């Protein structure tokens, strides 16, 4: 199988009535969610801390992490296993990004490398050059499969920096496409590029609330790993 040749963004697309209705409903529900957080009688930070921790658990469970919902509240007191560290690292990525967005108004390759390094810190993928864009051809498929047996082969490594720069131009612009369309296309493009040797899925899922916070000038408050 040959490496995929990714198109640059923005792309042309069409929406049917059903999708337009769903996007309108999503915007409405998101507005209600933000309003409820803002007008809540309790400190929403405690709620968001729990949501961020739950998101970290859900995202890493997709990758096979064996930590239960009950265990996640006691991670600080549990042995430092790879599963434990992966959840804590993902939570740290969100916290780091919240602070980054207070002083920066765009996502960059440097920022992406930094959060990828945090994500893979001291875990089983640590030998796969955390914080560095891949310089080899990777592919997706059953464990141990060859490139010929792959389900998908991402773009060649030489194209990764160019495609990321183009992606970030799109991600950082709130006016090219409607908000949730921008998020969906950005997520799809990031996973298509598969910029790192490992951790692309977790990083891609983390970028959704980060990009949403950037475009709405808010904190990361919407996490979608459970439904992706």
Model-derived features with residue positions:
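FIC/Doc superfamily catalytic core
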Residues: 1-228
